[in-house]
Amino acid sequence: MGLLTILRQQKLKEREVRVLLLGLDNAGKTTILKCLLNEDVNEVSPTFGFQIRTLEVEGLRFTIWDIGGQKTLRNFWKNYFESTEAIIWVVDSLDDLRLEECRNTLQELLVEEKLLFTSILVLANKSDVSGALSSEEISKILNISKYKSSHWRIFSVSALTGLNIKDAISWLANDLKEIKLGTIDY
């Protein structure tokens, strides 16, 4: 194997990013993934287990692990933390009855040693529906800033209409590029 081949392989590795797509069940994780992949968002069933999809964003290759959010599956999430560089956390902005559970579950993740230096993208999904909480309201409830001073952001999105989905994933890609270049503080 020549030096040029080794350098090319290293450059490809630098572009690869492992992303976990997490959140409570029925938040819209799989629908968001289908939206990102330009697939039909009307044909979605609950994820029991996980699925892995790849997506090119801003010159990075995201390997996205869409993992089911049912309570019985959350104990297995830790098995996927190794080498994770980003988490996309999906919140159902209509489900105010489960926001405390959502906050507690997210905060458990934020203190995991293997996830301390990950970028966190919070997607307040279903924001196109009347009665949805704003991203500001959800941000206040989740209280992420208590655990992370930087490298997180929240977007109000709609997986069904595509509202703000591309902007959100673009923010994540740019944040990860900044981290990979080593020009940031945690």
UniProtKB/Swiss-Prot annotation:
Keyword line: Cytoplasm, Cytoskeleton, GTP-binding, Lipoprotein, Microtubule, Myristate, Nucleotide-binding
BP term (GO), one: protein folding
Record lineage: Eukaryota, Fungi, Dikarya, Ascomycota, Taphrinomycotina
Protein name: ADP-ribosylation factor-like protein alp41
Compartments, record wording: Cytoplasm, Cytoskeleton
Alphabetical list of NCBIfam families matching this protein: small_GTP
Family (UniProt): Belongs to the small GTPase superfamily. Arf family.
Function per UniProt: Has a role in the cofactor-dependent pathway of microtubule biogenesis. Required for growth polarity control.
Species: Schizosaccharomyces pombe (strain 972 / ATCC 24843) (Fission yeast)
Single GO cellular component term: nucleus
